[in-house]
């Protein structure tokens, strides 16, 4: 059976200070360094995490380098045993973000008003409510990337929606390179290293 919740242990500010990455005032200590994030995923399909990911997950060297695994939490509806296995066998260097817009696949800009195609009112509160239960269960606070596609980019209401369940950040496409929306970091999806 699934656990009630799968909390994540994030690196603390103190640990980052001890490693020399943060100054005492909480600002980043660059010291001429560049930083890179290893984002593993686009695991938005049960076939990916049940058939492909095990080859990566079972690699003996996993855990030597911090990795951000991006898995759609709604996959718990299709392959809960796989989701459970990854979380209970994660190393301290395995972190998790939600893949592809959150707990499901859509273009969230289409939920913002005005909704010219449907004429409906904003669907952002329904999206936040839907995502929140999955984020809380799986200990998620980051949305790995937000696919805008043909939809408008997120406006202030759209950013507020994501901040309500993804407070540690989102990575949309149609945004400035970096932005801080209230306290939520926003980094534009840009180039991939394949």
Residues of each region from the PLM?
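Short charge-dense sequence patches
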Residues: 30-35, 66-77
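Non-catalytic propeptide/linker segments at domain boundaries
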Residues: 1-62
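Metal-dependent polysaccharide deacetylase catalytic core of the NodB/CE4 family, i.e.
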Residues: 71-153
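Sequence-level detector for tyrosine residue identity
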Residues: 6, 21, 39, 43, ...
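Structural preference for beta-strand elements that scaffold enzyme active sites
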Residues: 35-37, 66-68, 95-97, 141-144, ...
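Aromatic- and glycine-enriched glycan-recognition loops and surfaces
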Residues: 44-55, 63-65, 74-87
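Active-site-adjacent pocket scaffolds in enzyme catalytic domains
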Residues: 1-16, 126-130, 134-194
